[in-house]
Design a protein with these regions (language model features):
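Structured alpha-helical
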Residues: 1-124
Length: 124
């Protein structure tokens, strides 16, 4: 089931040096929806195909312990496939390239809390 987290913007990085690319001005913004998230990466849908190995900046927010936190994390595309149902829809899997381990811990905590909430709802 879709988590419904909207990735506000995804900047596609074209340079091999990802740090310089993140700061460069020639970045396209791609609207996409995160379908699944884990401590290791995200699966999302978008309207433009991404090449495997592409680095991009994922910008999204998660509700963590009563407050919403913004994340800006560099990701690397692992796989991108076209939807069987819609010609203009693609599904991509990417792994996080973390600068700080605390970001990963916060995402893992979000996933854990979300699973606990779902289990609680199923038991009601």
């Amino acid at each position: 089931s879709a988590m419904g987290i909207i990735m506000a913007a995804t900047w596609i990085l074209t340079l091999p040096d990802r740090i310089r690319a993140i700061n460069s001005k020639n970045m396209n913004t791609v609207k996409s929806v995160i379908l699944d998230i884990s401590g290791g990466g995200i699966r999302f849908s978008l309207s433009t195909p991404l090449e495997e190995g592409t680095y991009f900046m994922a910008q999204f927010s998660l509700a963590l312990e009563e407050c919403t936190q913004q994340f800006n994390i560099v990701c690397k595309v692992i796989k991108c496939t076209q939807s069987l149902d819609y010609a203009d829809r693609y599904f991509a899997r990417s792994k996080f390239i973390f600068d700080r381990i605390t970001e990963r811990e916060k995402i893992v905590r979000f996933v854990f809390e979300e699973e606990r909430r779902i289990r609680r709802r199923e038991m009601e």
